[in-house]
């Protein structure tokens, strides 16, 4: 009986270790795929690429894109959250988020806002689009709360 119990403990320990290794491999594959997808889609040939994103400057303005990736074990999907800041000379700035399934290319969520000024020159976001799946949102905080299940599970 003692040998049986020791054998069961060993079996669970080995299978737990193997599961952790396979999850780690999936997370690494996700990170690599997200990085390739991000660079291809958001960082053109003229950009300066660093580990956290890419930067492009041209006569019209500046563009900075960053990203994070997450392997969601519950959904068995790899997600890329791209975040862009764009500033055009003499005009508004733009703030853009896109949540994308790396394997299928499906867009799960979008947040796009222009930065404007009110009559007292206070900065405010002018939200052009904010949606996660079929849910509409009204702020960046609401957007971040709605994407949390995709990026934290």
Q: What are the functions of these language-model segments?
A:
Residues 29-33, 42-44, 53-55, 77-81, ...:
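Sequence contexts marking disulfide-bonded cysteines in secreted/extracellular proteins
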Residues 59-113:
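Mature extracytoplasmic domains of secretory-pathway proteins
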Residues 4-15:
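Sec-dependent N-terminal signal peptides
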Residues 24, 72-74, 124, 131:
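Processing junctions and N-termini across compartments
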Residues 18-68:
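N-terminal export/targeting and maturation segments
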Residues 37, 50, 85, 137, ...:
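Cys/His-rich zinc-coordinating "finger/knuckle" motifs
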């Amino acid at each position: 009986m003692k040998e049986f119990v020791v054998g069961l403990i060993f079996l669970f320990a080995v299978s737990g270790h193997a599961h952790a290794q396979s999850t780690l491999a999936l997370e690494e594959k996700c990170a690599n795929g997200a990085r390739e997808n991000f660079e291809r889609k958001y960082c053109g040939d003229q950009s300066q690429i660093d580990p956290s994103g890419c930067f492009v400057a041209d006569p019209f303005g500046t563009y900075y894109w960053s990203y994070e990736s997450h392997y969601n074990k519950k959904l068995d999907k790899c997600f890329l959250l791209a975040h862009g800041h764009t500033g055009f000379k003499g005009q508004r700035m733009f703030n853009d988020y896109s949540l994308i399934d790396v394997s299928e290319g499906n867009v799960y969520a979008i947040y796009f806002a222009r930065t404007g000024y009110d009559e007292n020159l206070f900065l405010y976001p002018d939200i052009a689009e904010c949606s996660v799946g079929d849910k509409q949102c009204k702020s960046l905080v609401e957007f971040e709360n709605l994407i949390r299940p995709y990026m934290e599970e």
